Amino acid sequence: MSESLSWMQTGDTLALSGELDQDVLLPLWEMREEAVKGITCIDLSRVSRVDTGGLALLLHLIDLAKKQGNNVTLQGVNDKVYTLAKLYNLPADVLPR
């Protein structure tokens, strides 16, 4: 069973906690535009697992923030996230470092 996903915006940082798993993404997906408003950093240090659905949502959050005029960095990213992106042949710069 998947752990829940929670998020909190503190200043310009969106901190995610739990699993970025397809089974628990819907609440964040529904709040995505509000969740990224004004953010320049997405903190994944409390994320325990990311699947392909979670990676897709993460990429979408980054894109939404960029469309709002913000450059986004990632913090606390597990190397497995970058490996997953590489396995799907995503461009190296799709996930900011």
UniProtKB/Swiss-Prot annotation:
Lineage, opening ranks: Bacteria, Pseudomonadati, Pseudomonadota, Gammaproteobacteria, Enterobacterales
Subunit structure: The complex is composed of two ATP-binding proteins (MlaF), two transmembrane proteins (MlaE), two cytoplasmic solute-binding proteins (MlaB) and six periplasmic solute-binding proteins (MlaD).
Pfam families: STAS_2 (PF13466)
Reported effect, residue 52 to A: Does not affect the assembly of the MlaFEB complex, but abolishes ATPase activity
Name of the protein: Intermembrane phospholipid transport system binding protein MlaB
Location(s) in or outside the cell: Cytoplasm
GO CC annotation, single: membrane
Disulfide bond positions: none
Organism: Escherichia coli (strain K12)
PROSITE patterns: STAS
Keywords tagged on the record: Cytoplasm, Transport
